[in-house]
């Protein structure tokens, strides 16, 4: 009986560790056209921030970033998330944008803005032990 309990407990421990290690290889992405930074809907900006807080995605990709009034939209969202206890990283972009829960190790413009549309940005980060590249386009 003791041996059976010991084997069962050991098996349960291995299954638990395996399940936990499998989970660390997963990440979530939220892609969102924020329709002029949420300005087209009353309370739109706050709704954007609140949905990110609710969902807690690893990465957020935005379309229709405008940086109105010489602001940095993604930095503003990161600051609002920080006020709610979440840490996200970003870099300056125009037309589309990226947020990451994981520190960004590199970012680049793949396709620059032309006639107020059409950007593609790339960022790199590490999730667990895996280097990941995330792209956003509009």
Language-model region placement:
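Hydrophobic h-region of N-terminal signal peptides that target proteins for export
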Residues: 5, 10-20
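Structured beta-strand-rich core segments of catalytic domains in phosphoester-bond hydrolases
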Residues: 41, 65-138
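Generic structural signal for short, flexible, solvent-exposed coil/loop and linker residues
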Residues: 7, 23, 48-49, 88, ...
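Short low-complexity stretches enriched in small and charged residues
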Residues: 12, 52, 56-57, 89-94
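Residue-level marker of intrinsically disordered, low-complexity segments enriched
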Residues: 11-15, 32, 89, 125
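N-terminal, active-site-proximal structural segment of metallo-dependent hydrolase catalytic domains
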Residues: 2-3, 19-80
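Ser/Thr-centric signal marking residues that sit
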Residues: 9, 31, 136
